[in-house]
Amino acid sequence: MSQKPSFFQKKYSPTATRRYYGKIATDFVQPNLADIQIRSYQTFLDHDLENLIAAYFPIKSPNDRYTINFKGLRRTAPERNEAQSRSESKTYEIGIYADLELIDSATGTIKKPRKSKKNSATSSVDGVFLTNLPLITRDGVFIVNGIEKFVIAQITRSPGIYMLTKSQLKLSSSRKRVQEGYVCEVLPANGSVMLIYISNKKKIEDAFVQILLRDAVREGAKIFPITTLLKAFGMSGKEILKVFKNNEFITRSLEAEVYNAKDFLNNVDPEIKNLLREFRDGKTDLRRKGIASDQKIRSLVSDYVLLEKEHKALSEAKPNDPKVGQLEADMDELMDKIITERAAKHIVHELSISLRGLENTDECPENSYHALLCSRFFRQRRYNLSAAGRYKVSRKLRITERIYQKTLACDLHLKNGELLLKKGTLLVKEEIDKIKQAAQNNQIDFVQKIKLTTDGSAVNLSPESLLYESLDVYVNNDNFDVSVPVVGIHNDNDLNKAITLSDFIASISYVINIPSAIGKYDDIDHLGNKRVKLINELISSRLESGITRMERFLKEKLTIADGVNRGQQINEEGQVIEQAEKKELTIKSLINSKPIQIVIRDFFNTHQLTQFLDHQNPLSELSNKRRISAMGPGGISREDPNLDIRDVHYSQYGRICPIETPEGMNIGLIMSLASFAKIDENGFLMAPYRKIKNGVITDEVEYLTALREDEHIIAEISSLVNIDENNKILDKEIIGRYRSMQGLYDPSKIDYIDVAPHQVVSIGSSLIPFLENDDSARALMGTNMQRQAYPLIKPYAPVVGTGQEYKIARDSGLTMLAPCSGTVKYVDNSKITIESDSGEQHTLDLIKFERSNQNTCYNHVPLVEKGQRVTKDEVIADGPAVNKSELSLGQNVLVAFTTWNGYNYEDAIVISERLVKDDVLTSLTINEYVAQCLSTKNGDEQITRDIPNVSDANKRYLDENGIIMVGAEVKEGDVLVGKVSPKGQVEVSPEEKLFKAIFPESVQNVRDSSLKLPHGGDGIVSCVKRFSIANGNELNDGVIEMIKVYVVQKRKIQIGDKLAGRHGNKGVISKVVPVADMPHLEDGTPVDILLNPLGVPSRMNIGQIFEMHLGYAAHNLAKRMLISACFDDKKAQALSTEINQPQYKLDRLITGLKAQITNRGLKDEQAALAQLNNGDIALVLKEIGMSFDDLHFKVATPIFQGVNFQDLQDIMDEAGLKPAETHGKFKLIDGRTGLPFEKPISLGIMYIMKLNHMVDDKIHARAVGPYSKITQQPLGGKSQNGGQRFGEMEVWALEAYGAAYNLQELLTIKSDDVQGRNKAYAAIVKGAAFPEPGIPESFKLLTKELQGLALSVSFIYDDNTQQDSNNVSILQADGEQDDLFNDFEFDTEGY
C-alpha cells in the first residue's frame, strides 16, 4: 500500500482505461459481488438438504417391527436448459430422490424402491421421488415458470442470551407479555423465548429471581421462582446455594417457593400428604397404581417411608449408631429426589406439556416428569439454539466477558498449584488475557461440576453440560467488604446446539450480578446481535415443516401396518380359523412426498422474500442480489414506528450501507450490503481490515464480525495518514475508532485499518462521484434513481466515474464473460467461439433483443475480434446499459445552469431537439402478449386467419395460420393472433336453420376471441414463439397451443419523461427546444440541457457541480490531445488507450484532422487549438462513423479519496479552461436573438440518466370504456382504459369559474347518468339534437338510502311537478330504452 501524488492511467479491461485520481493505491481484491446466495444455495444442495432429511430417520413403527432407514439423496439432471426454461415458461429444476430401505424385523427382509416400468422412460433414478427443486443459475437467480426470481436475504435477531432492561414475550398476534427490570432473554432458534429476571416493581432488597415461560399451547405465560425450575432439573437446595454462594436474590427465591426440604413434609400438597399417609399405613400396592408418569413419584415416596421406618426403629434402639446419620443422609437425598419430581410435575402441568412425550424412549429414557421436562429443554430438536446461537451464548457467558475492571476476591491458582493471580488484583486486559490463555489450555483451577439429585445420563444431561466456572470478585473496587461469585460456562462445545444446565446457571449468575454493575446490557440494534439468513436457511426452515408432515403421515401408515402383517378371521366361538395375507408393504406405498412438494412450490411462488428479479439495468439486478430485508417471516412489520431499528448503527460500518435504503415506509428495513461485506458461516456480517503490527500496515487482510471489531481499535484509511515506503505510519497520532467512539490514538495501539475508503458504502453509492460533497438525503435519492435508469440504445460510460463501473458490469451477470483463457476463433452478432489454451473450443450464444422482467431490452454486443487473445472472466460482449465493458446507465451531455423563459421553473428541464433526433436518450421497450388455445367443454379453440366479423385491413399482417408476421408495424386494435372459440349451445331460429341448410359451410358457431394489441402498445413485432402439445411442448392443463408475440417500442425522449443525475438531481422535461434556439458557446457548440440553478443550493448536492466542471475539463482535454496528436506521432500512439478507441479508427480521425489543418494553413499546435472548433472536428467524426461521445477522456475519482480542489484546477488548466479567470463559467449566446446572456453561466458535461417513469406509460385518453357494475361510473386507471377522477375540489374550481354546463356534463352523462349517456351517444351517431341530461345514478342511490332511514323523498322539478322517488329505480329495466335506440344494436359486453 502506498500513496500516489496525483494520477495514473488505470486499465480495467482491454477496452476500458481511465485516468485514476485515487490517493490511496491498494492491491486488495474485491470479492465477487453476486456469489453470496450462489454459495449458500450450493451448500444447501450439497450438505444441508441431505442432513435435514437424515435427521428424521430412522423411522420405526410403534412395535419396532418396521424400520425405514435413509441412505442418501440422488439428483437428476435438469430436463431443459436455462434458455428453454425462459422460452417455454417452465421451471429450471432438478429432481430429488431419496434412497430409502424398509426393514421388516419379523421376516428379516430389506426392501428398496426401484424405478417402475411405467416411468422407466422418464426416470433413470432408483429411489423415492421427493420433489423437484429449482436450480440456481450461474448468475445467481432461479427460473420459475419462465420468470427469473431471487430470494432476498433476511436480517433478524440472532438466537442467544441477552441482558436487557425490558423485554416481551409474544403470546399471539395481538397479545404479548412485557417484562421490565434486570431481564435475561433466552432467544432460541427453535423453541419458546424464556425470560429470567429480577423485577423492578419491588424494592431491590425484596426482589428475587423469577422465570417467565410460555405454555405449550402458546395461549399464556407462567411465572416460577428460578429455584423451582432448577430443582425440577435435578439440583437440590443445598447445591443451588453452593453454586451461587448464598446470594441474596437466590436465597429469597428459595424462600418464595414451596419446595424446601425442611418443611416440605409439613406444608406439602394433598397428593404427597395422601401418599405418605397410605404408605405409612402399609398400602404398598399403591406403587403400581395410577398413570405411568406418576409411578416414579409414588416409588420415591414409598422408598422414603421405608427409610423413615428403619430410621425410627434404629434411632430408638441404638441412638448413637453411626448408621443413624447415614440413614438421615439417605432420607435427605431421597427427599431431594421427591422434590425434583414434584417440582417437575408442577411445571409440566402449569405449562400444559403433553405427557405423550414420555412414549418416545429416545427422548425420555426414564418415565418421569423430570425426564420429560429435561427432554423439553435440553434436547436439540425441542430447543435449538443453532450454531449462531451457541456461538453467541458461549461468548456471552464466559467469565472473562464480565470481570473487566473488577478486583479479584480470591487467589487464582493453576492446576499444578502455581499462583496465577493473587487476591486484590485489578483485572484489566493483560490479566484477563492470562485467564483466557490458561482456560484454553485447561490449566486453571476454577472449574466445578453441578451435583444432581438424579442420574444426569438418564435424562440426556452429559457430564460436560454440568461443568461451570466460578470466580469471586469484589462489588466495589474501593471497598473490599462484599464479594459476589461470577459463574460462567466451561469448555463450550460449539457443536452442541442445545441449551445446557450450565447455560442456565451462568445466565442466572449474569442476572444477579447486573445490579452490582458486573456485566453489561446488550444493544439489540448492534450487528453483533443480528444475523443474516441466507437462502439455505430460509428454504430449510420451510422444508422442515414439509418433512415433518411427511413423517407424521408415514408414522400413521406404519402404525396401521404394525404388529403382524396378516389378517385373522375368527369364528363365532372366538377361534382363529384362517390367516389371510395383507397387501405387501413397499416404501413407495408408505411415502407421501406431497407436503414437501407443496412447501417448495409455495416458497418460490408466495414467500415474502422471494421476488421477481429487478431487471431494470445491471446495477438494479446486482443491487437486488445484495439486498437484505428486516421484514419477512418472524421479522419486523413495515408499520412498526420504532426508529432505533431503522437508524444507522456504528456497527454497520463496512457491512451495511448507511445510504442505500428506500424512502417510504420501508426506510431502514430494506438495506444493502456494503461493497466488501461478507457473511460468515454463522450468518454474521463481516468487514475486511488490514492488520497493523507495531504501527506498520501489513498486507494481511482479516474479515471481522461486529463483535470482534468491538475488541479492537481501528483506524480510518485516508490520504491524510502519512506512510513511508515500508507502510509505517509516520504520524504521532491518527484518527481511530473504538466501538462508537472516535479519537486520536498512537499508531502502536491501533490493531487494524480500513482496506479502502469506499468500503463503508454499497456498490450503488460507490458509483456517485464526489459523494462526500452531497447531502445524505440527496445521496440516497441518487443511489436509488440509478437503479431506475432505463437502458438506452446508445449507452456511454460516464466521463466522470469512480472506478467501480467495470467491476459492477462484470459481476452483474448481464455481460458475457470468457469461460477460459484462449483465442477468439469466430465472432459474429449471435455467437462467439473461443479456443482455450488446451485446444478445447467453447461456443457462447449471445442474447439478442430479449425481454426482461421490467420489459427492457436485453442485447449482447461483441467486444472481441477474431484472433484476439482473452483471459478467463474477461468481458467479451457488452450487455444492456454496458459500453466497452463499463456500466453505462445514461449519457454525457452538455448542461448549463440558467433559467429559460420559466420553462425550467422548480425542477422542470429544458432539452435540445438534438437529444431526440440523434437518439441520445432513446430506449427500447419490449412487451409480451400471450394467446392460449384452450380445450373447452364446447370444443377446442382454434388459431386461424378466418375470423368472423373482422375486416381484411385488421388482418393484413397475419400469415396463413392467423399469426402476426415478424417485422409488422402494429397499432392499437390490430389482431396479433387470430383465434376463434366455439359458442355454447343456443337455440337456433328458423331463419338460421334455413340459412344453414342452404349454406352449410358459411355459418360458423364460433366467436372471435383473437389476441389484439391493447391501448398504448404500438410498435414492431420482433419475435413470435409458438408452442403446442402436438410438437411435444409441455403446456399447462387444458392448453392445446400457446403463442407469444413480442412487440418492440422505440421510445424517444419527450415532454413528460423524467431525467436524473447521480446526485439526487431529478426533473421532468417541460420543453423540447430546436437546436438553433438553444443557448450556445462562442464557438457555436449548442447546450443540450438547461437546468434551474436554484435547484442546487437548497438541496446541498454540490457534487454535481464538481462533476460538471471535471467532465467539461475531460471533454476539452480529449479535444486538445487529439489536435496535439496531429503534430506529434508519439502522442498519437498513446492516445488510443487514453480515449478507449481502436487504433485504426484513431488513425483515420487524425488523417482527417490533418487534412483540415492543412487546408486552413495552420502552422503549429497553438494555432490549431485556437481556430479548430467542435464543428470542424464533428465533420471529420461523422465521415468515419463516430461522434463526440466517442472522444471523451475518462477519469476515475473514487469517493472519499478522489479529485480534490487542486486536482480540479490542474486538469482544467491542462484542458485550457483557465479556472482562475473563468471560475468554470462561460459566455453563452441566446440562439433566438444571437445576443449573449448578461453574465457568464456555469456549464459542463454531466451524466444524465433516463428513468423508467416515462410519459408513455402514464398518460392515456378515454372516449368509450368500461363502467363499474355497482356505481355505473367509469373505471379508473390506464390498465382498465379508465377515466380521470373529477373530485370534490375540481367541482369547486368549475363552480368558481361559473362553468355550469361543463360541470353538468361531467356529473351526469360523462359519469353515471345511464339513460342520459345512452341518449347522448345515440344523438351523436344520428346527428340529432343533444338531449337534456337526466338524474345520475349516485343521486338515485342517495334517495334509496334516505328511504332506508324511513324518510319520504320526492322530486320537485322546475315546473313544480312532483314525482315520488319510490317510483324511480336505480337502473332502468330492460326494454325501456329511448326511441332513439330503436334503429341501433349495441354490443354492451364489458360496458
Swiss-Prot record:
Q: Name one GO molecular function term.
A: DNA binding
Q: Does the keyword Lyase apply?
A: no
Q: Which Pfam family is an annotated match for this chain, by its short name?
A: RNA_pol_Rpb2_45
Subunit field text: The RNAP catalytic core consists of 2 alpha, 1 beta, 1 beta' and 1 omega subunit. When a sigma factor is associated with the core the holoenzyme is formed, which can initiate transcription.
The cross-references to Gene3D superfamilies, in alphabetical order and at most eight, read: 2.40.50.100, 2.40.50.150, 3.90.1100.10, DNA-directed RNA polymerase, beta subunit, external 1 domain, DNA-directed RNA polymerase, subunit 2, domain 6, RNA polymerase alpha subunit dimerisation domain, RNA polymerase Rpb2, domain 2
Keywords in alphabetical order: DNA-directed RNA polymerase, Nucleotidyltransferase, Transcription, Transferase
EC number(s): the record gives 2.7.7.6
The answer to whether keyword Transcription applies is yes
Job description of the protein: DNA-dependent RNA polymerase catalyzes the transcription of DNA into RNA using the four ribonucleoside triphosphates as substrates.
Q: What is this protein called?
A: DNA-directed RNA polymerase subunit beta
Family from the record? Belongs to the RNA polymerase beta chain family.
Looking at the record's lineage, which domain of life comes first? Answer: Bacteria
What is its EC class? transferase
